[in-house]
């Protein structure tokens, strides 16, 4: 199962999965990707849980 959490450190709309993943690693998540959230793309961090 994968648990997802919106990044707390990522600023602004998310257009780059690699940037998102880099920020997520600083938040102790192994990976992250951009996902649509209403009208804005946000960075979501993922880990196995």
Swiss-Prot record:
**Bridged cysteine pairs (disulfide):** 3-49, 14-34, 20-43, 24-45
Give the matching Pfam families: Gamma-thionin
At the top level of its lineage, which domain of life is listed? Eukaryota
Keyword list, A-Z:
Antimicrobial, Disulfide bond, Fungicide, Plant defense
Its annotated function is as follows: Plant defense peptide.
Q: Which family does it belong to?
A: Belongs to the DEFL family.
Provide the protein name.
Defensin Tk-AMP-D2
Species annotation: Triticum kiharae
């Amino acid at each position: 199962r994968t648990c997802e959490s919106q990044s707390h450190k990522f600023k602004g709309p998310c257009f780059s999965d690699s940037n998102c993943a880099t920020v997520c690693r600083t938040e102790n998540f192994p990976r992250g990707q951009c996902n649509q959230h209403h009208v804005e793309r946000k960075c979501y961090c993922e880990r196995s849980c």
